[in-house]
């Protein structure tokens, strides 16, 4: 279980935000947020626009529920570094540490995150994901009807590389090491899609659009 009372080692200090500011972190769409505890909206948020895309790494100091709808030409890829699976879910399915997320621009996405959740995200144009899928599979979309995919992103060789890649983002974004590489979007897209395609069926929970 993740303890949201403290701040994890190596994580930037939590700051107090208003919900309107946090709701605009994705920039291309608003996130509707509802507080579920008395901690108040405290978080650490690092983000950078790079190569037509948005990189974001965040730590939540409060429990909340949210919903958003991506515009038709955007997709969202992400990785859960830490969370409480008893309190965190996406479309009714528990979110676990080590899980990778792919959200396509169809319908409303609903989720809940526990205090102490740490995650990294890549918001990128849908055409770039389609191009990568075509490059690796000769098709430009996920299996029919699959608009949201969850899979374990820290098992297997390719998935381990994916976990390591996402783990680099906080240091890149806060400038403590090196800046984002020029090809950071391409690298992350390639490893995310490879891990998604290679993941076994039992590692990809079936997602509905309802809690």
What are these regions (language model features)?
Residues 50, 69-72, 95, 114-116:
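A generic fold-level signal
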Residues 36-70:
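Conserved short histidine dyad/triad with adjacent acidic residue
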Residues 2-40, 86-211:
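Alpha-helical bundle regulatory/interaction domains
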Residues 60-87:
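Glycine- and acidic-residue-biased ligand/ion/polar-headgroup-sensing regions
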Residues 47, 55-57, 76-77, 100-102, ...:
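Conserved hydrophobic/aromatic beta-strand scaffold that supports enzyme active sites
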């Amino acid at each position: 279980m993740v303890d949201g009372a403290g701040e994890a080692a190596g994580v930037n200090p939590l700051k107090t935000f208003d919900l309107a500011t946090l709701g605009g972190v994705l920039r291309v769409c608003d996130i509707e947020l509802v507080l579920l505890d008395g901690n108040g909206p405290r978080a650490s948020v690092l983000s950078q626009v790079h190569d037509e895309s948005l990189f974001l790494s965040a730590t939540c100091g409060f429990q909340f529920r949210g919903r958003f709808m991506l515009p038709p030409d955007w997709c969202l890829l992400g990785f859960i570094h830490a969370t409480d699976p008893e309190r965190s879910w996406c479309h009714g399915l528990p979110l676990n540490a080590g899980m990778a997320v792919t959200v396509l621009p169809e319908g409303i996405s609903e989720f809940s995150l526990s205090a102490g959740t740490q995650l990294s995200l890549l918001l990128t144009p849908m055409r770039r994901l389609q191009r990568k899928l075509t490059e690796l599979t000769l098709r430009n979309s996920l299996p029919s009807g699959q608009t949201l995919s969850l899979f374990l992103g820290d098992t297997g060789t390719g998935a381990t590389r994916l976990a390591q890649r996402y783990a680099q983002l906080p240091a890149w974004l806060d400038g403590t090491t090196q800046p984002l590489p020029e090809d950071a979007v391409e690298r992350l897209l390639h490893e995310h899609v490879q891990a998604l395609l290679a993941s076994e069926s039992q590692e990809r929970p079936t997602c509905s659009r309802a809690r």
